[in-house]
Swiss-Prot record:
Keyword Glycoprotein: yes
Source organism per UniProt: Homo sapiens (Human)
Disulphide-bridged cysteine pairs: C95-C188
Function: Odorant receptor.
Subcellular location: Cell membrane
Pfam families on file: 7tm_4 (PF13853)
Name assigned to this protein: Olfactory receptor 14I1
Main location: membrane
Amino acid sequence: MDNLTKVTEFLLMEFSGIWELQVLHAGLFLLIYLAVLVGNLLIIAVITLDQHLHTPMYFFLKNLSVLDLCYISVTVPKSIRNSLTRRSSISYLGCVAQVYFFSAFASAELAFLTVMSYDRYVAICHPLQYRAVMTSGGCYQMAVTTWLSCFSYAAVHTGNMFREHVCRSSVIHQFFRDIPHVLALVSCEVFFVEFLTLALSSCLVLGCFILMMISYFQIFSTVLRIPSGQSRAKAFSTCSPQLIVIMLFLTTGLFAALGPIAKALSIQDLVIALTYTVLPPFLNPIIYSLRNKEIKTAMWRLFVKIYFLQK
């Protein structure tokens, strides 16, 4: 049987034992975080201030931007601070809070991508019924239900992981509180914990994956029937990057959850963790919004207004 200890804090592995690499890691993460911050705040401001963008699609894009800011803020700022100060500890309650919010925002990310794929399905496959199906009230209900469901899921998920205040070890073999690595430390009825965590995660991921694939299958089927080759190419160029990000997010997240937990920080674990924690918030503004002509036009109008107001 593993030795059990009552812990009050956890220790994280450093990104590198070399100070210069620690600074490089902090600088790179800071640039990524600032890019995500600026991009998403700009999208939120533009969609909020421009009346032309008060439609269901942009309502969900604004929710996704808010979510991306929250999602990346759970892990990256703390990681930057740890690298610069070389302080790798986090309190037990701090770890619980971070796991809770990470679970909530990760599940909400998946849920909102699913809702947005359904929105595109209705817009492309049933354009005449779009306004009747995607009403303002219906969109608000979907958004509120998504947020509440994901925070409830995170509460069950986190509560199940931290049922007892004892662990096998206080050292997390990752440079942030990655859920699989934390799960490997908790000691309470390990098999039951892992089984329930896997069951909850599998139901969420599989359900969202099936719904997204159905939506995109219908979208591509409709697009292939479009007579104009230029319109087909435009539709494919819009949907393909979205699918790539979704598949990266799902596959790396599942691999991290189902794969073996390494005894030390490895390059493979690092790449996988970065792919599903940093990459989606970084790419989503580019793929879903900044490549969008209406968003770029609205940004231009906003910049023009600001320019003339200052004169």
